[in-house]
């Protein structure tokens, strides 16, 4: 599934460029100049999810939802660590604040400094807490896709609030794109979790249990065949 990584990066770039089109309209080829900066995490998540769907549905012929359950936890770890890149680059921070949680930055051109909301830290910690909680709950999941829904709900909830603090948001009219997407995805995921919570679920229908049952049946069949030969 390594090919999904460049797929996610490409979608992260396209997502960013789509909402910053005025920068690229006169020279669309510059969309390829990714080293100049300009990617968005939501584009990466959407791209990775789409890549997983293609890989599972058309290549491996396995459960898309079951794989999304697994990679969702990986998403949270990746986002938790990846946000620290914003710290080292001194980017993607919030507005000026006097909060006890603040990050000091000095303008290299003027030599003046100020304290800002370290939104990278907020999101990193939010993902860490989410990973711990969802990892624990994943051991009691009742259906394929449940973990993925919890991830979407958790991340969307945090991002909807954190995005409102940032100074570098992508805008669509008067709306912060990622904030709207985060709130909408959180709401949809929560509704899905509530609806599915009231439906009966057979643990044997979990993809991992189906695979285990199939493997056990094949092993039993092989043992029976060997015993028959021995007779």
PLM regions with names:
Residues 1-231:
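A feature for loop-to-transmembrane-helix boundaries and adjacent hydrophobic helices
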């Amino acid at each position: 599934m390594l090919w999904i990584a460049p797929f996610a990066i490409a979608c992260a770039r396209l997502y960013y460029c789509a909402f910053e089109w005025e920068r690229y309209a006169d020279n669309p080829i510059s969309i390829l100049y990714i080293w100049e900066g300009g990617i968005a995490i939501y584009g990466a998540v959407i791209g990775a999810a789409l890549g997983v769907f293609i890989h599972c549905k058309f290549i491996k012929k396995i459960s898309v939802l079951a794989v999304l359950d697994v990679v969702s936890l990986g998403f949270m770890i990746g986002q938790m660590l990846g946000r620290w890149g914003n710290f080292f680059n001194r980017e993607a921070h919030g507005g000026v604040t006097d909060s006890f949680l603040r990050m000091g930055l000095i303008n290299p051109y003027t030599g003046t400094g100020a304290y800002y909301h370290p939104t990278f830290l907020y999101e990193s910690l939010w993902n860490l807490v989410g990973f711990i909680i969802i990892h624990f709950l994943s051991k009691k999941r009742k259906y394929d896709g449940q973990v993925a829904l919890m991830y979407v709900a958790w991340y969307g909830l945090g991002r909807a609030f954190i995005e409102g603090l940032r100074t570098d948001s992508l805008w669509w009219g008067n709306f912060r794109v990622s904030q709207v997407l985060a709130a909408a995805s959180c709401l949809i995921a929560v509704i899905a979790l509530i609806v599915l919570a009231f439906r009966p679920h057979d643990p044997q229908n979990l993809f991992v249990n189906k695979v285990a049952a199939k493997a056990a049946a094949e092993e039993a069949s092989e043992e029976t065949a060997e015993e028959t030969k021995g007779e």
